[in-house]
């Protein structure tokens, strides 16, 4: 049965700024208060989408959130008109305004966890929006995320949508950034790989000491139950707490998987041999041949992996059966990482090609190629049922670039967030975007 993996990339929102909001994310914190360029950021993301589409990969787009989020500010006690709410927040609690203005929804790997129909009990594609409860600025995303996903995948014969898990630390869920799937072919039953940082209820599991573990085992298990996954098709693994403390805040900063291949750092997991053996066994029972490519720490240190985002890459299957690794420019700028990649593609392994993209605006906030996309494996009939307005084409690319040129600023500092005009600019832009993408009314300001 013919099936495809479609990458739905997050469109960078008009309020893209460097607020330094993400404790545990080294790049985010180190670039705090820098001046951003939302127009450039959006165009860098669109250029990646267009390039992959032109290479023959299925590509979609996921709309950004409406920011500043005045409803969130009202819930924190700011009152008056929207303009008055923003002015008061800027005067009394600038960190809250910065949080409610974040464009972090661009990193759609955190939008949701997705299980394809070949894996689920009812034969539908399942989506669970991530609660992202570890960070306030991201915890306010999931209601809009759910509405946007429902507008994109709106045929309930093929798609099932679940609300985010309870917004408490015991069920901290960061979505697909801690989830990947292995399979022989995208339409075959596969093995879903959930990676957690700690257990909420079992003290036998170790935990990081410096930075928080954002994903719990219990959240992973809950999502697997919601999606109707069988035990034979699920593997749970704990991320190494030591690498979380080195800035590996999601598993997609230290490993990436696709098809039958896991590309990972030597220090990515606890009990690595046991984890790999279980993946090999379970994928083998489903007709696949699991293969792990381990990057030794003496060739690429964890620090280099974090700085370059080597593993926050896209691993894509080409038509000839080989794989392409999509990496950020920072990998080419790191001699140790680039030497490793040169060696990797020269070997007789599955990864034969590396493609480099300039994603500096996103990277400075701590998000590489993998952060920017949500993978959805779809059968032909399911792909035909997706809202066609969100599938990338040459025409849509041109339309979105023109839309960005009309509505986005090329400079945004923290003080600019206090400008009530920014709110009006963003709402005007997003109101137009929902028409371009044929989403209907998905934003709170459209529903009020």
From Swiss-Prot:
KW Magnesium (keyword) present: no
Segments forming a coiled coil: none
Signal peptide interval: none
Gene3D superfamilies on file: Succinylarginine dihydrolase
Active site: 174, 250, 371
MF (Gene Ontology): N-succinylarginine dihydrolase activity
Claim: Hydrolase is one of the keywords in the record: yes
InterPro entries according to UniProt: AstB_sf, SuccinylArg_d-Hdrlase_AstB
Residue sites binding substrate per the record: 19-28, 110, 137-138, 214, 252, 365
Record EC number: 3.5.3.23
UniProt KW keywords: Arginine metabolism, Hydrolase
Pathway membership, UniProt: Amino-acid degradation; L-arginine degradation via AST pathway; L-glutamate and succinate from L-arginine: step 2/5
Pfam family, any one: AstB
GO biological process: arginine catabolic process; arginine catabolic process to glutamate; arginine catabolic process to succinate
Superkingdom classification of source: Bacteria
Family from the record: Belongs to the succinylarginine dihydrolase family.
Subunit structure of this chain's protein: Homodimer.
Its biological purpose: Catalyzes the hydrolysis of N(2)-succinylarginine into N(2)-succinylornithine, ammonia and CO(2).
Protein name: N-succinylarginine dihydrolase
Originating species: Pseudomonas aeruginosa (strain ATCC 15692 / DSM 22644 / CIP 104116 / JCM 14847 / LMG 12228 / 1C / PRS 101 / PAO1)
Taxonomic lineage: Bacteria, Pseudomonadati, Pseudomonadota, Gammaproteobacteria, Pseudomonadales
Gene name of this polypeptide: astB
């Amino acid at each position: 049965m013919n099936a495809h993996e479609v990458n739905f990339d997050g469109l960078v929102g008009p309020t893209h700024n460097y607020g330094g909001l993400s404790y545990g994310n080294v790049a985010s914190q180190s670039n705090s208060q820098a001046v951003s360029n939302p127009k450039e950021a959006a165009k860098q993301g669109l250029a990646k989408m267009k390039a992959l589409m032109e290479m023959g990969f299925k590509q979609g787009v996921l709309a950004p959130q409406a920011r500043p989020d005045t409803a969130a500010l009202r819930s924190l006690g700011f009152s008056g008109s929207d303009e008055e709410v923003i002015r008061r927040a800027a005067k009394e609690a600038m960190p809250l305004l910065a949080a409610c203005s974040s464009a972090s929804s661009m990193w759609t790997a955190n939008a949701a966890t997705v299980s394809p129909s070949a894996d689920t009990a009812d034969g539908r594609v399942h989506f669970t929006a991530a609660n992202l409860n570890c960070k306030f600025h991201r915890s306010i995303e999931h209601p809009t995320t759910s509405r946007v996903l429902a507008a994109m995948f709106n045929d309930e014969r093929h798609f099932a949508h679940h609300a985010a898990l309870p917004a408490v630390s015991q069920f901290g869920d960061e979505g697909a950034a801690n989830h990947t799937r292995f399979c022989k072919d995208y339409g075959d039953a596969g093995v879903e790989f959930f990676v957690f940082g700690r257990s909420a209820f079992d003290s036998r599991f170790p935990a990081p000491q410096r930075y928080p573990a954002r994903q719990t085992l219990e959240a992973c298990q809950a999502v697997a139950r919601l999606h109707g996954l069988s035990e034979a098709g699920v593997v749970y693994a704990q991320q190494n707490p030591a690498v979380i403390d080195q800035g590996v805040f999601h598993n997609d900063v230290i490993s990436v998987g696709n098809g039958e291949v896991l590309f990972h750092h030597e220090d990515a997991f606890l009990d690595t041999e046991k984890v790999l053996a279980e993946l090999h066994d379970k994928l083998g029972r489903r007709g696949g041949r699991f293969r792990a490519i381990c990057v030794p720490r003496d060739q690429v240190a964890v620090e280099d992996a974090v700085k370059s985002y080597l593993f926050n890459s896209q691993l894509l299957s080409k038509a000839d059966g080989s794989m392409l690794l999509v990496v950020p420019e920072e990998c080419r700028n790191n001699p140790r990482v680039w030497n490793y990649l040169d060696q990797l593609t020269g070997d007789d392994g599955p990864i034969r090609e590396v493609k480099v993209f300039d994603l500096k605006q996103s990277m400075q906030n701590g998000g590489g190629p993998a952060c920017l996309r949500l993978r959805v494996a779809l059968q032909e009939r399911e792909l035909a049922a997706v809202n066609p307005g969100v599938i990338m084409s040459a025409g849509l690319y041109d339309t979105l670039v023109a839309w960005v040129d009309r509505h986005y600023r090329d400079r945004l500092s923290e003080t600019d967030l206090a400008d009530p005009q920014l709110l009006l600019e963003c709402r005007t832009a997003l109101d137009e975007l929902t028409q371009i993408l044929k989403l209907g009314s998905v934003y709170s300001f459209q529903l009020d």
